[in-house]
C-alpha cells in the first residue's frame, strides 16, 4: 500500500518533466508511504515516476519503488497488493523468468513483459499502477475491478499527470475551476461519483479500467472488468447446486478469500464489530495456535443501546483468544479531530469518520495492515435497499404512467404545510425502474432540490454531465435478477464511490492498509451464480458454515451497520454544521471545498 505519481511530457512542445513538481506531488502523499520514497526518470527526461512506500510485502530495500525491469525497458510505480503473486511468480519461473526480489511489484513487471495488459485478468488483489513501457513509449494506468485503490489523472494536452490523490495532483499546474458534475454529484449522493472530481482538470480512472498514453495523447479508457457485467452473467447462468451444497460452496469461498488476504511480511490484524461480516473474518483468521489482533470501535453515545457493538465484539474476541482492544470515541474526540479529518479527506464525503477513528487507533497500536468486513452487505444482500427498491418498482408497475403522475403529485406535495419529506414526495415518480428507485433510496438531496442549493444553471449542467439515469441503467444492463441488480448498484455506486474511497483516504492518512476479503473478484465470481439460484440464502446461514464459533447473539442480531452518532455530534452546541448528514454535507460544501 503506497502513494504513486507520474508525469509524461508526451507532446513535443511540452517541457521535460519538472523534477521539483514530481517530488512535491509525491511528498504531498507522505502519509500513504512513510517507510520510503523513490523517483525514476527516463533517460530523455520525458517521463518521471514517483513513489511513497508503506512496506508490507518484501519489506527489504529490494522491494523499493519505482521498480525497473532487469533489461531497463519497463518501470512501474504500484499501489496495492496482489494476493496471488506467489502463484503467478511460480508460473513465471516455470517459463524461465528469474526474480531479484520477493515482491509482488516485480511479478507485475514480468507479467506485463509476457502478456501485456491481458495480465490484468490474472490478478487477485487491490491495485492501481502507472507502468512505463520504454520500448513502445507509452504510459499505462490500471485499477482493480472494484476500485479499492484510487488513481487520478490530469491532461493539459501536452503533459499527462497521475497521482493516488486529487490533492496531490493539485500541487501541479491543473485546471481547478469547479466541475458541475462533481459538485452536483456530491450533494446528490454524499460522495463524488467516478470519473468526476470537484475540479475540471482532474478525472478518476474508473474502476476496472486501464488507459494508455503515447505521443499522440491519452486513448479512451478500456474496461477490462465490469462488476455489473459479472453480476449480469451470473443472473443469466445461475448455479445448479442444491441449496445446502450452495451454502457450503459460498462458505468455502469466503474462507479462501480471507486466507488469501493474509499474505504479508508484517502482522495483519482485523477490525471487529458485532456484525456478522467482521465476526466471520475474525473467526477464520483465528486458526489453532494463532492469536489474531482485533480492534473494536465504540461510541460513548451508544453505551447500553442496541447500537453498542463493543460487548458482543469483546465476547467473541475472548472466545477466539484474540489480542483485543476497544476504542471508545466521544463527541469531544470528533470536535478535536474534525479539522484534521477534513484536511485529509481527498474528495468531499459525508462518510469516513468511523474509519478515521478506528484506523487511527490501529496505527497507534503499531498495526500496518488490517482486515475489514466492508463489502459484506453488498455481497450478501443485507441492506434494506435489497427489499425496498424492488418493492417500490412492483408498486409502480401497477400504475400505467407512474412518472408523470408522480411528478405532478410531488409538485402538489410541495404546497402542503408542512411539505412532505423529499423522498416521500418522490416515491411515485421514482418507482418506474430499479435504477430510479435506487437513486431515490440512496440520494442525499433529491435532484429537484439541487437548483435551490447550487443555482438553476449550475445544477442543470451538473445533472446533464452526470447523466445519472442512463449510468444506473448501464450498471444493470442484461440483468433482470432483483437481488443481483441491487448488488450491482450498491457495489458500483455506494460502495465504490463512498465506502471504498473513504476507507482509502481515512486509513492512508494514518499510514494503515485496510484489506477487504469480501470485496474480491474471485469471491464474487464464485458467489454470484449461487445467489442467482438461491436468492433467499441468508448471511447468518453462510456465517454458521464458514465461521462456526460465532455466537447466536451475533448471528441473529438486528442489523445496525458500522454507524456513528452523527446526529448527536452535530447537534448544537457543537460548532460548525447543524444536525444530520444533509447539514454535514452542506457544511463541507459551504466551506468552499478546496481540494488543495
Language-model-detected regions and their locations in the chain:
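Adenosyl-5′-phosphate
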Residues: 1-4, 10, 23-24, 43, ...
Amino acid at each position: 500500500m503506497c502513494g504513486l505519481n507520474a508525469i509524461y511530457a508526451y507532446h513535443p512542445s511540452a517541457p521535460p518533466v519538472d523534477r521539483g513538481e514530481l517530488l512535491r506531488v509525491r511528498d504531498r502523499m507522505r502519509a500513504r508511504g512513510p517507510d520510503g520514497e523513490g523517483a525514476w526518470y527516463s533517460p530523455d527526461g520525458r517521463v518521471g515516476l514517483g513513489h511513497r512506500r508503506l512496506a508490507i510485502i518484501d519489506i527489504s530495500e529490494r522491494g523499493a519503488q519505482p521498480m525497473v525491469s532487469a533489461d531497463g525497458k519497463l518501470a512501474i510505480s504500484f499501489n496495492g497488493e496482489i494476493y496471488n503473486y506467489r502463484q503467478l511468480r511460480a508460473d513465471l519461473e516455470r517459463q524461465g523468468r528469474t526474480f531479484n526480489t520477493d515482491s509482488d511489484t516485480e511479478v507485475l513487471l514480468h507479467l506485463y513483459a509476457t502478456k501485456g495488459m491481458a495480465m490484468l485478468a490474472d490478478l487477485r488483489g487491490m491495485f492501481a499502477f502507472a507502468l512505463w513501457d520504454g520500448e513502445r513509449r507509452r504510459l499505462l494506468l490500471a485499477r482493480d475491478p472494484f476500485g479499492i485503490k484510487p488513481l487520478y489523472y490530469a491532461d493539459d494536452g501536452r503533459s499527462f499527470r497521475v497521482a493516488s490523490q486529487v490533492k496531490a495532483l493539485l500541487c501541479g499546474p491543473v485546471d481547478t475551476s469547479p466541475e458541475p458534475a462533481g459538485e452536483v454529484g456530491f450533494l446528490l449522493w454524499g460522495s463524488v461519483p467516478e470519473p468526476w472530481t470537484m475540479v475540471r482538470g482532474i478525472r478518476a480512472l474508473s474502476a476496472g479500467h486501464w488507459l494508455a498514453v503515447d505521443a499522440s495523447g491519452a486513448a479512451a479508457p478500456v474496461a477490462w472488468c465490469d462488476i455489473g457485467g459479472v453480476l449480469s452473467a451470473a443472473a443469466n447462468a445461475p448455479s445448479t447446486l442444491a441449496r445446502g451444497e450452495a451454502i457450503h460452496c459460498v462458505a468455502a469461498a469466503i474462507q479462501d478469500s480471507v486466507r488469501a488476504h493474509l499474505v504479508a511480511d508484517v502482522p495483519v490484524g482485523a477490525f471487529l464489530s458485532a456484525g456478522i461480516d467482521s465476526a466471520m473474518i475474525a473467526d477464520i483468521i483465528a486458526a489453532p495456535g494463532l492469536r489474531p489482533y482485533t480492534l473494536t470501535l465504540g461510541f460513548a453515545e451508544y453505551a447500553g443501546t442496541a447500537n453498542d457493538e463493543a460487548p458482543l465484539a469483546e465476547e467473541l474476541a475472548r472466545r477466539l483468544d484474540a489480542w483485543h482492544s476497544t476504542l471508545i470515541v466521544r463527541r469531544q474526540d470528533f470536535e478535536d479531530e474534525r479539522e484534521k479529518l477534513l484536511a485529509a479527506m481527498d474528495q468531499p464525503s459525508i462518510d469516513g469518520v468511523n474509519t478515521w477513528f478506528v484506523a487511527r487507533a490501529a496505527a497507534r497500536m503499531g498495526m500496518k495492515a488490517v482486515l475489514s468486513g466492508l463489502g459484506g452487505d453488498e455481497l450478501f444482500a443485507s441492506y434494506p435497499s435489497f427489499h425496498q427498491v424492488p418493492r417500490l418498482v412492483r408498486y409502480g408497475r401497477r400504475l400505467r404512467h407512474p412518472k408523470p403522475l408522480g411528478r405532478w403529485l410531488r409538485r402538489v406535495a410541495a404546497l402542503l404545510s408542512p411539505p412532505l419529506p423529499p423522498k416521500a414526495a418522490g416515491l411515485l415518480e421514482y418507482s418506474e425502474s430499479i435504477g430510479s428507485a435506487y437513486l431515490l433510496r440512496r440520494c442525499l438531496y433529491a435532484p429537484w432540490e439541487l437548483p435551490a442549493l447550487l443555482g438553476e444553471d449550475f445544477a442543470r449542467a451538473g445533472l446533464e454531465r452526470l447523466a445519472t439515469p442512463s449510468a444506473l441503467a448501464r450498471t444493470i444492463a442484461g440483468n433482470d435478477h432483483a437481488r443481483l441488480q441491487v448488488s450491482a448498484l450498491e457495489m458500483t455506486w455506494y460502495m465504490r464511490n463512498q465506502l471504498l474511497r473513504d476507507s482509502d483516504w481515512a486509513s492512508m492518512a494514518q499510514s494503515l492498509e485496510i484489506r477487504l476479503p469480501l470485496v474480491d473478484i474471485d469471491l464474487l465470481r464464485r458467489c454470484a451464480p449461487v445467489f442467482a439460484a438461491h436468492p433467499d440464502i441468508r448471511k447468518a446461514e453462510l456465517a454458521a458454515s464458514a465461521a462456526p464459533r460465532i455466537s447466536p447473539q451475533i448471528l441473529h442480531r438486528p442489523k445496525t451497520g458500522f454507524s456513528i452518532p452523527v446526529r448527536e455530534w452535530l447537534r448544537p452546541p457543537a460548532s460548525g454544521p447543524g444536525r444530520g448528514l444533509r447539514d454535514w454535507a452542506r457544511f463541507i460544501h459551504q466551506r468552499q471545498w478546496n481540494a488543495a
